[in-house]
């Protein structure tokens, strides 16, 4: 059996296992500003769709938002890996997320032969959120009170809307925006939204595509390919996890604790990493499960 044949045969049991299962993929990192990388990811998502998986895409846009802010002479501010969002930043986020990136992904899906529907969390009551309260966070070695501004915590997901789109053969493309119960706009961390949507849809998999190869050790020399919830708690406690990896792991842990079978964090900048993670025995990134089992 040659290498091509062995790759296909290695994929077969996974394709069979994942058939008709729901997978939520969070697109983030450099792919948001590199159309070639984005198209490669979209090709993978369309392939998953055509082998029988129910695919939901949730996209970020952090690098693009930061570039737009810089062009307008505004500096981005982050605390604990979360963007501080004032009114002007919220307007920029809405323009970039729902206006530019969402439309670009839907167009790429169409060019690759599938049907995408671009929606944001504030369409059709898809996501109801509440403003994130002022809270104490560690900034360096100091504990400070932080107001993230127009940033929300997800409270409700209208899963029926997404199920209707999936049943009709569409790939939902979701921008991480939401409304509160009074109709006020809020920005939602894309990792958090993807995790909550995965829980609401009872998804089999949650995938986070980012700029790093997975969850790394403190020295950043080694990837943890398999982690349990207990492992993640230990890494969070000893300071191994920091910056933008914090919300990714928090979303992954929350999803797994609420029934998602496996959460994966991997580099989305290498061609077809998504397929290698899902359809090969060794994978390429980090998989988080409730216990050390193979999925």
UniProtKB/Swiss-Prot annotation:
GO terms for molecular function: acetylglutamate kinase activity; ATP binding. Its EC number is 2.7.2.8. Pathway: Amino-acid biosynthesis; L-arginine biosynthesis; N(2)-acetyl-L-ornithine from L-glutamate: step 2/4. It catalyses: N-acetyl-L-glutamate + ATP = N-acetyl-L-glutamyl 5-phosphate + ADP. Its main location: cytoplasm. It comes from the Archaea. SUPFAM superfamilies: Carbamate kinase-like. It is an enzyme of class 2 (transferase). InterPro entries: AceGlu_kinase-like_sf, AcgluKinase_fam, ArgB, Asp/Glu/Uridylate_kinase, Glu/AcGlu_kinase, NAGK-C. Keywords: Amino-acid biosynthesis, Arginine biosynthesis, ATP-binding, Cytoplasm, Kinase, Nucleotide-binding, Transferase. It is found in: Cytoplasm. The record marks 26, 248 as: Transition state stabilizer. Substrate binds at residues 61-62, 83, 187. GO terms for biological process: arginine biosynthetic process via ornithine; L-arginine biosynthetic process. GO terms for cellular component: cytoplasm. Disulfide bonds: none annotated. Catalyzes the ATP-dependent phosphorylation of N-acetyl-L-glutamate. Belongs to the acetylglutamate kinase family. ArgB subfamily. This is Acetylglutamate kinase.
């Amino acid at each position: 059996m040659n290498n091509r044949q062995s790759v296909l045969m290695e994929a077969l049991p996974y394709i069979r296992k994942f058939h008709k299962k729901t997978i939520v993929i969070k697109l983030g990192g450099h792919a948001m500003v590199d159309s070639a990388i984005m198209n490669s990811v979209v090709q993978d998502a369309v392939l998953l769709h055509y082998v029988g998986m129910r695919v939901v895409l949730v996209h970020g846009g952090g690098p693009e938002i930061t570039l737009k802010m810089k062009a307008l002479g505004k500096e981005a501010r982050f605390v604990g890996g979360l963007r501080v969002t004032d009114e002007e930043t919220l307007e920029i986020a809405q323009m970039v997320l729902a206006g530019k990136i969402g439309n670009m992904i839907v167009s790429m899906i169409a060019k690759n032969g599938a049907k995408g529907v671009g929606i944001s969390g504030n369409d059709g009551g898809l996501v109801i959120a509440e403003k994130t309260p002022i809270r104490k966070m560690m900034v360096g070695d100091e504990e400070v009170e932080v107001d993230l501004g127009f940033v929300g915590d997800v409270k409700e997901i209208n899963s029926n809307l997404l199920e209707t789109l999936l049943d009709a053969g569409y790939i939902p493309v979701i921008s991480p925006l939401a409304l509160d119960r009074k109709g006020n706009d809020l920005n939602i961390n894309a990792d958090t939204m993807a995790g909550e949507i995965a829980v609401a849809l009872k998804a089999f998999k949650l995938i986070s595509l980012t700029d790093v190869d997975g969850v790394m050790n403190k020295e950043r020399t080694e990837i943890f390919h398999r982690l349990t919830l207990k492992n993640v708690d230990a890494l969070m406690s000893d300071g191994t996890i920091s910056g933008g990896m914090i919300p990714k792991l928090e979303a992954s842990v929350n999803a797994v604790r609420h029934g998602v079978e496996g959460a994966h964090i991997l580099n989305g900048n290498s061609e077809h990493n998504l397929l290698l993670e899902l359809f090969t025995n060794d994978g390429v990134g980090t998989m988080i499960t409730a216990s050390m089992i193979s999925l």
